[in-house]
């Protein structure tokens, strides 16, 4: 592409961080395209670099800074004219970024979409708020049902970054979902910082189940629920999963820990007893459900005995999917006032122990699937190998089903029946049977 001053600028958009950020970038892209702007995947063909940053933990912040410095380098080389930075990192460090990187042409927070668009030569149109240009594969998308968070978890800076919890009205979400369906989306993944309290601010009660039922009626192949908080979780949605074939038997519910002292320090609002009862209730209501969770190892003051309690809990509960992260001492989180007593080396050691335990659990659970025929969604095809997921696996984080397709007529976005022949802790291997 030859750059000229007569045409509108071409944008290179780099979207970092979580799926919530992805949705923000998709909304921005749709608005910009409606104003006649074009986007390119080749930075050397761009006039403008726009980076949607993450500021959640140290590693994510560093990635955002590194990418911004690289973009500034492209500007200094004359490859691009302008560099704009938006998103979570700006919410936390706007002043510092402006002082340390004056080469940035504009800084925008998480709630400044009209301003970002104006800077790159586009116009914000309220009537296009529901429209998105997908950055995911076309067969699945994320539906952000709320913005912000009212929880005050001590390790988390999201409320400071994203502001208070604001639910999107059901009718608006249904319009957005209909547009996604028209684009060919088959799997809809419901996301927020906390889906459990969706609707309280609008309707005075949880509306998560109502929304799920309405979306189910629209005929999506799969509807998946991600990022549930254990406190105030609406159990009726678990029954809906059992009753509605297109609502996946899957819930992602980060628990973070199980020791009562640590949960209290984390300001989670729920203790061990209530957590265990909730898990029992979920599994009794829907025995086919798969439960994903996330844990933190090395929280300030975590003793070896408290960590062993967490290991025992995981051993007993046998989560279907589990991730673990070392505690990061983040200056904008309230736990920053605590002494970071566990060394980085010990944190990594504990993460390794926990994930080794989970690897054994996952391998055992996957072995039970050998010989079964499962419905899968084909995510991508590389040469003669297809990578797929079952309803029990969310995009990007869970098991892959790996299929040697040979001469089979298979396309990305297809649903197929697969006979599982072999497995590892995080992979299933099978052949197409229908």
UniProtKB/Swiss-Prot annotation:
GO terms for biological process: tRNA modification. [4Fe-4S] cluster 2 binds at residues 149, 153, 156. [4Fe-4S] cluster 1 binds at residues 18, 54, 88. Residues 367-434 form the TRAM domain. The keyword S-adenosyl-L-methionine applies. Binds 2 [4Fe-4S] clusters. One cluster is coordinated with 3 cysteines and an exchangeable S-adenosyl-L-methionine. It comes from the Bacteria. Pfam families: Radical_SAM, TRAM_2, UPF0004. It catalyses: L-aspartate(89)-[ribosomal protein uS12]-hydrogen + (sulfur carrier)-SH + AH2 + 2 S-adenosyl-L-methionine = 3-methylsulfanyl-L-aspartate(89)-[ribosomal protein uS12]-hydrogen + (sulfur carrier)-H + 5'-deoxyadenosine + L-methionine + A + S-adenosyl-L-homocysteine + 2 H(+). Keywords: 4Fe-4S, Cytoplasm, Iron, Iron-sulfur, Metal-binding, S-adenosyl-L-methionine, Transferase. It is found in: Cytoplasm. InterPro entries: Elp3/MiaA/NifB-like_rSAM, Methylthiotransferase, Methylthiotransferase_CS, Methylthiotransferase_N, Methylthiotransferase_N_sf, NA-bd_OB-fold, Ribosomal_uS12_MeSTrfase_RimO, rSAM. Residues 9-125 form the MTTase N-terminal domain. SMART domains: Elp3. Residues 135-364 form the Radical SAM core domain. PROSITE patterns: MTTASE_N, MTTASE_RADICAL, RADICAL_SAM, TRAM. GO terms for molecular function: 4 iron, 4 sulfur cluster binding; aspartic acid methylthiotransferase activity; metal ion binding; protein methylthiotransferase activity. Its cofactor is [4Fe-4S] cluster. Its EC number is 2.8.4.4. It is an enzyme of class 2 (transferase). One of its GO terms (cellular component) is cytosol. Belongs to the methylthiotransferase family. RimO subfamily. HAMAP family: MTTase_RimO. Catalyzes the methylthiolation of an aspartic acid residue of ribosomal protein uS12. This is Ribosomal protein uS12 methylthiotransferase RimO. It comes from Chlorobaculum tepidum (strain ATCC 49652 / DSM 12025 / NBRC 103806 / TLS) (Chlorobium tepidum).
């Amino acid at each position: 592409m030859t750059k000229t001053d007569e045409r509108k600028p071409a944008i290179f958009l780099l979207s970092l961080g979580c799926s919530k950020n992805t949705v923000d970038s998709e909304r921005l892209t749709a608005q910009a395209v409606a104003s006649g702007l074009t986007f390119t995947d080749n930075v050397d063909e761009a006039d403008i670099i726009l980076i949607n940053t993450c500021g959640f933990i140290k590693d994510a912040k560093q990635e955002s800074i590194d990418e911004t410095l690289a973009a500034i380098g492209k500007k200094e080389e004359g490859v691009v004219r302008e560099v704009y930075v938006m998103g979570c990192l700006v919410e936390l460090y706007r002043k510092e970024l402006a002082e340390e990187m004056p080469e940035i042409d504009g800084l925008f927070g998480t709630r400044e979409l009209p301003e970002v668009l104006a800077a790159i030569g586009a116009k914000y149109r309220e009537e296009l708020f529901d429209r998105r240009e997908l950055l995911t594969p076309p067969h699945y998308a994320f539906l952000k049902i709320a913005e912000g968070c009212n929880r005050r978890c001590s390790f988390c800076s999201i409320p400071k970054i994203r502001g208070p919890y604001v639910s999107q009205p059901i009718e608006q979400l249904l319009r957005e979902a209909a547009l996604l369906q028209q684009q060919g989306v088959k799997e809809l993944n419901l996301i927020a910082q906390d889906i459990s309290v969706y609707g309280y601010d609008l309707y005075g009660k949880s509306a998560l189940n109502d929304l799920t039922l309405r979306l189910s009626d629209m005929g999506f192949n799969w509807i998946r629920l991600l990022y549930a908080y254990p406190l105030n979780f609406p159990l009726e949605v678990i029954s809906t999963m059992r009753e509605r074939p297109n609502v996946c038997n899957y819930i992602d519910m980060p628990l973070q820990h199980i020791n009562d002292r640590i949960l209290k320090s984390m300001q989670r609002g729920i203790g061990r007893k209530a957590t265990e009862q909730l898990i029992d209730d979920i599994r009794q209501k829907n025995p086919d459900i798969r439960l994903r969770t996330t844990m933190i190892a090395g929280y300030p003051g975590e003793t070896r005995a408290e960590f062993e309690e967490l290991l025992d809990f995981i051993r007993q509960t046998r989560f279907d999917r589990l991730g673990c992260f070392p505690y990061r001492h983040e200056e904008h989180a309230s736990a920053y006032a605590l002494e970071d007593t566990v060394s980085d080396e010990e944190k990594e050691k504990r993460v390794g122990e926990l994930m080794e335990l989970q690897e054994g659990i996952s391998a055992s659970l996957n072995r039970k699937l050998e010989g079964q025929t499962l419905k899968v969604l084909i995510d991508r095809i590389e040469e003669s190998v297809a990578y797929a997921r079952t309803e029990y696996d969310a995009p990007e984080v869970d098991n892959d089903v790996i299929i040697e397709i040979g001469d089979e007529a298979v396309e990305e976005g297809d649903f197929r029946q697969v006979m599982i022949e072999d497995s590892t802790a995080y992979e299933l291997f099978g052949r197409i049977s229908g």
